[in-house]
Amino acid sequence: MPQEESAPRMDTPSSEEPLDKQNRKLEDQEEEMGFKELDGLREALANLRGLSEEDKSERAMLCSRIQEQSQLICILKRRSDEALERCQTLELLNTELEEKRLLEAEELKAKNQQAQKLEERFMTLASNHELMIRFKDEHKRQNAKLREENEKLRLENDQLFSPALKAQEAKVVQLTAQSEALAKELETLQRKYAHDVCQAQAREQELLELQNRQACAHTEETEQLRMQLQSLQQQQQEALQQTAKAEQAHSQQNQELRARLQTVTREKEELLLLSMERGRVLQNKQAEIRQLEEKLKMADVARRHALERFEQEAVAVNSNLRVRELQRRVDGIQAAYDELRLQSEAFKKHSLDLLSKERELNAKLRHLFP
């Protein structure tokens, strides 16, 4: 029996094999040992039947040895089960630790990326700050230089130009002020016209909404009257005795419908009167625009006369710098006048568009209420 016990111990698998395979091999070896012990017990019992007292005492010793071996086997099996449980627990702990390690690695990677982005942003901000400082210094330097040049030019202008040119400059300033006043007047008229147009559009929208509501109400009333008429016809077919009463109610409803139609007709006439009044307002605005255009033409003529006088007087002056300065101012006045003329044309075009829209609206109203 000791030889049989030593044999399975030599067949124990190495630690390099997986734990589940080792457990299965241990279980198989224990089963084989149990079968072998049972076979040995059967053989021993068969031999004991034909043995003497000495053999029986020897058999008792063998039985005690067998019990000891079985106890040892139980102890070994219990230890192997405990070792298996410890291995499984260690595997679970290892798995949890591996998952935690992966999570910590991902968090560390994310924090590293965030730190890298913050560092890149900080470097970008630092470079932008340096560029801003350089730009500010350069701007200060150029500003100081331009101020010095401006002061020099002002002193030269004070020394070079005569009172005649100053008077001419005063005339140019006066013409510029007149042009600005005309521009402000035009802007005021434009704002007033825009306000009137907005009010007219709002009134038109209100009238259209009122018309739509009245049309819907009229349609609903017509539908209700039609349904009532059908009901009256059915009642007439069912009960011939109530014919007189039904005709009287029907005539009353027709009278109410005529009265409502007359009310709608009066409202349509009021809408037409409002549209005509709006047309008169637009005509008045167009008259104001024509007056403004005449003023612009007069200002243009005055500007041309001033330019001619300025050119005649500028020929006698032997200073290219002052002539260029005055020419720049004249060009500025010309640009302002061109811009004012373009605004006037745009305002005129907008007025024509509004007039065409009003005509279309009047045509639609006439089509709806012939």
Curated annotation (Swiss-Prot):
Residues 18-38 have a biased composition (Basic and acidic residues). Its main location: cytoplasm. It is found in: Cytoplasm; Nucleus. It comes from the Eukaryota. Keywords: Coiled coil, Cytoplasm, Nucleus, Phosphoprotein. One of its GO terms (cellular component) is cytoplasm. The modification Phosphothreonine is found at T12. Interacts with HEY1. Belongs to the CCDC89 family. Residues 19-346 form a coiled coil. It comes from Bos taurus. The gene is CCDC89. InterPro entries: CCDC89-like. Residues 1-38 are annotated as: Disordered. PANTHER family: COILED-COIL DOMAIN-CONTAINING PROTEIN 89 (PTHR34768:SF1). This is Coiled-coil domain-containing protein 89.
